Amino acid sequence: METNVDFSSISSKLYRKYAQHVRNLKDVCVSKTVMKPGAFFDSLQQMMEEEAAATTPPRDLSSVADYAELFKTLEEYPANLQKMPKKRELQRTNSTLLRGADESVAMGINTSNVSLSLTRLEEQRSAVDVYNDFKGFQRKLAKIYDEAAALDTTESIYKQKLTQLHGFAQQLEKLMPTGGESPPDAFTSEQQEKLLTIAANMEQLNYLRSNSLQLPNPNEILATGSLAARLEMFVEVLTYTLLQVSSYNMAMI
């Protein structure tokens, strides 16, 4: 009676007990041999001859009955092979396969069409939602167009301002002296002192205005000759003069 030996249990016990000597066990149990090329090819030739002798029929075919038996064996195909069908049968088989393929494709198309038609209506967007999205898109486009137009308007305004500044700079260049001699002072020393006095009086007047102090009536100014009232009238004259000069400069530009 043959005894079944579980080599996996034996190997697991050996690996568990002699884990550190696994390499030594392999070297002892496995014999390694290296053959020379000549000896390898001689042994290969011998193995091929032995294989050919095993598959070659033991006797020669000498009679018609032996040949008939051989052809009968060739006509019988094993289970994993199929006999090659004739040409007419092959054409009939191909046409059947093509017809079946066309029917399967048509069936798949019909199935997809049916699945599309069975899609729930609530999963599809309504016409109202599409129209609302379109109107929102139109509003965004109009807003972007207005912003672009505003930018163009601002750019044109800045261009006009730059043109005016360029003209003003040209006018200033014309007014600047070109000779090497230093130009005379615009005001004499006495005039400068008067202007400084006027500026100090204007500061006092601004202080009076900022503190809401009451000034006398112009009729009282003429009657009494108050200094503060006279300064008030002088400031009004200067303001009018400055406005006229500014208007003239703007007209020149």
Curated annotation (Swiss-Prot):
Signal peptide: none
A Gene Ontology term for the protein's cellular component: spindle
GO annotation, biological process: cell division; mitotic spindle assembly; mitotic spindle-templated microtubule nucleation
Keywords carried by this UniProt record: Cell cycle, Cell division, Cytoplasm, Cytoskeleton, Microtubule, Mitosis
The organism's place on the tree of life at top rank: Eukaryota
Subcellular locations according to the entry: Cytoplasm, Cytoskeleton, Spindle
Chief location category: cytoplasm
Quaternary structure (record): Component of the augmin complex composed of dgt2, dgt3, dgt4, dgt5, dgt6, msd1, msd5 and wac. The complex interacts directly or indirectly with microtubules and is required for centrosome-independent generation of spindle microtubules.
Function according to Swiss-Prot or TrEMBL: As part of the augmin complex, plays a role in centrosome-independent generation of spindle microtubules. The complex is required for mitotic spindle assembly through its involvement in localizing gamma-tubulin to spindle microtubules.
Name listed for the protein in its UniProt record: Augmin complex subunit msd5
